[in-house]
Amino acid sequence: MDFSIKAFNTKNAITQHKSSCIAVGVYEGGKLSHAAKALDLKGALGAALKSGDITGKPGTTLLVHLSSGLAKRILLVGLGAQDNVSDRNFTSAVQAVARVFATLGANDGMLALPLDCVTGRDAHWALRAEVIALRESVFRADGLKSKKDDTANGVRKVTLAVDVADAATKRALAQSVALANGMDLSKTLGNLPPNIC
């Protein structure tokens, strides 16, 4: 899985980013995150909230197909209460995104969850949580199988939305990918039989 970061601000709006699927956050009580509000130009996301199709509870998802715009699909993801998004709720939301991304018939996707919403954590921690959860979802221990699992489907290129794409954020992404690589290697070695490892 390939990761990249993209900063969105007033000059570079999220509505101008072309993607097969953009995952945005929804809070309990029917509140859209900033990215979701920006993408809700025709009111489809707000209507989905009002209809009760998604509650905003952590890990709940709703895929909305769009007929126009640069994004073909918007994935609404529940984050829990807006004033108290815990580590667990955020990780649960990212794992839910990973499950949906694995089933999509698309090659690219974007995570635009609010990185600064997690209580007691910074944006770099949230970035690391996103990378690790997405990489865990695609890990397969099929190195010794005669017929490997078919994993061709699903999102393979993920863009992570950030507020600022400075050197510290790029370093945090590189460290997150390195950590995920180490976790994959540990799992691979742990799954090998004793006569090989």
Regions found by a protein language model. Give the residues of each.
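Short amphipathic alpha-helical segment within the helicase RecA-like ATPase core
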Residues: M1-C197
